[in-house]
Amino acid sequence: MSTFGARLAAAMDTLGPLCVGIDPHAPLLADWGLPDDVDGLRSFALATLDAVAGVVPAVKPQAAFFERHGSAGVAVLEEVVAAARERGLLVIVDAKRGDIGST
């Protein structure tokens, strides 16, 4: 298997340089008519993956929005990473803390 950088460069050559963030914060889930729980996280994230697969090379789930639901939220994050890979998307998990507010 090639390096992540090589796979990213190849995907960017084909699909361009965009990376879609997956930031399922409570107000956004509410806007989508989804509950602020692990089922809402899963529905939002999988719908996002379906919408962007084949359009962008990568997605970036924000770990904190999943972690706030405890171990069940982390399990959903793992599902999302696996589902993204199955759809041919590269994954960059955003797990930094304290750098900026929500963007």
Q: What positions do the PLM features span?
A:
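Active-site loop-to-helix "anion-binding N-cap" substructures in soluble metabolic enzymes
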Residues: 1-103
